[in-house]
Amino acid sequence: MKIYIVGGAVRDELLGVAVKDRDYVVVGATPEQMIAQNYTPVGKDFPVFLHPVTHEEYALARTERKTAPGYKGFVFHTDAGVTLEEDLIRRDLTVNAMAKDADGRIIDPFGGRRDLEQKIFRHVSSAFAEDPVRILRVARFAARFPQFSVAAETNALMQAMVAAGEVDALVPERTWQELARGLMEVQPSRMFAVLRDCGALQRMLPELDALWGVPQPEKYHPEIDTGVHVMMVVDHAAQQNLALPIRCAALFHDLGKGVTPPEMWPRHHGHEMQSAKLVETVCQRLKIPNDCRDLSVMTAREHGNIGRALELRAATIVTLFERCDAFRKPQRFIDMLQASECDHRGRTGFADVPFPQNAYMQKALAAAQTVNGGEIAALMQQRWPDQPARIPEAIHEARVKAVALAINEVKTPG
């Protein structure tokens, strides 16, 4: 029985990156032998055991065989005769198909170390094509290691997988799981570049793929191309280390520009409402969680208004707060301001240009929150007990006055 550290832990150690999780493969052992040594069995599809002290996962070496489309169509085989190389060859990329033994010796049968040095993602074998999730994994790794490129033969294989319909067999939850993980990496735009290059983005997110080649007014968008702009916005959100819902909102905020009739280009009048509708559709299809969906829909609908915030009247601002449910969910509204600021900065030459609208709207919201709705409601019930409709009107007017005072102070300080 021999135990090896495998996969990402070996890769990251060679790269000088902090190792977070270690995966172990056990060669030459049976489940009965593992249990006899006090390992706890936890695997459903194949034998995985928890170490009795560290509780880290140890998997018996295994092979796998494709039996149906998609990422679930596999039969696994494991016994004491499966070799380390047989286990490693089923892995996705050469850089993830290395192992380290107890003496610290690196076992690298597929040239992973060479590809690490050359910063190349290359598939281990033709078995890569059996699991469409691997396309998403390669794209996600590109977002984590943006200096790496995908080998030409690997990209060609991914293109063939897309053409064969393998990507269409992915379940929505798994697609979103991988996209979300990629969005949280250091340079999410690399993930989408890889997905576009192999044609997978058009199958998974046609609404997003449609943005490349769609022009915007150069006066406001020196980068011109909408797809390029959206990638800059998402990368800015990553640079600011913002939460997943904000990155998701950054990704989807301009989907409506992809359906603007070409004769209207480069203008996109009314794209905000179109964007909001498309975001709803995408989130429903991919089963995207509610926090990401709600913020993305709101950002798509309102980012134009936030951009014009300094021109809005107090009454319009309060109506916007009410429409966004900002009094019950103020943090979500602030997150939307953050996403809108990413939209502003995600343009060529605008990365360091101030965006006073964020602080301006937060100040306005804070002023509106000082209004005591309960007191106003009690007073109105005393004066007009038979006219309950006047209560929300009175609260609205009080908030408008508070906001007007606050924004007037901002515009005319001192």
Swiss-Prot record:
Positions contributing to ATP binding: 8, 11, 91, 137, 140
Similarity comment: family membership: Belongs to the tRNA nucleotidyltransferase/poly(A) polymerase family. Bacterial CCA-adding enzyme type 1 subfamily.
Entry EC no(s): 2.7.7.72, 3.1.3.-, 3.1.4.-
Catalyzed reactions: a tRNA precursor + 2 CTP + ATP = a tRNA with a 3' CCA end + 3 diphosphate; a tRNA with a 3' CCA end + 2 CTP + ATP = a tRNA with a 3' CCACCA end + 3 diphosphate
Organism, scientific name: Herminiimonas arsenicoxydans
Cofactors that this protein relies on: Mg(2+); Ni(2+)
Note accompanying the cofactor annotation: Magnesium is required for nucleotidyltransferase activity. Nickel for phosphatase activity.
GO biological process: RNA repair; tRNA 3'-terminal CCA addition
Domain HD: 226-327
Misc note: A single active site specifically recognizes both ATP and CTP and is responsible for their addition.
Subunit structure: Monomer. Can also form homodimers and oligomers.
InterPro entries assigned to the protein according to its UniProt record, in alphabetical order: CCA_bact, HD/PDEase_dom, HD_domain, NT_sf, PolA_pol_head_dom, PolyA_RNA-bd, tRNA_CCA-adding_enzyme
Residues bound to CTP: 8, 11, 91, 137, 140
Record protein name field: Multifunctional CCA protein
Gene Ontology molecular function terms on file: ATP binding; CCA tRNA nucleotidyltransferase activity; cyclic-nucleotide phosphodiesterase activity; magnesium ion binding; phosphatase activity; tRNA binding
Cross-referenced PROSITE patterns: HD (PS51831)
NCBIfam families in the record: PRK10885.1
Function summary: Catalyzes the addition and repair of the essential 3'-terminal CCA sequence in tRNAs without using a nucleic acid template. Adds these three nucleotides in the order of C, C, and A to the tRNA nucleotide-73, using CTP and ATP as substrates and producing inorganic pyrophosphate. tRNA 3'-terminal CCA addition is required both for tRNA processing and repair. Also involved in tRNA surveillance by mediating tandem CCA addition to generate a CCACCA at the 3' terminus of unstable tRNAs. While stable tRNAs receive only 3'-terminal CCA, unstable tRNAs are marked with CCACCA and rapidly degraded.
Keywords assigned: ATP-binding, Hydrolase, Magnesium, Metal-binding, Multifunctional enzyme, Nickel, Nucleotide-binding, Nucleotidyltransferase, RNA repair, RNA-binding, Transferase, tRNA processing
Residues annotated to bind Mg(2+): 21, 23
Comment, domains: Comprises two domains: an N-terminal domain containing the nucleotidyltransferase activity and a C-terminal HD domain associated with both phosphodiesterase and phosphatase activities.
Gene designation per UniProt: cca
Classification via Pfam families: HD (PF01966), PolyA_pol (PF01743), PolyA_pol_RNAbd (PF12627)
Lineage: Bacteria, Pseudomonadati, Pseudomonadota, Betaproteobacteria, Burkholderiales
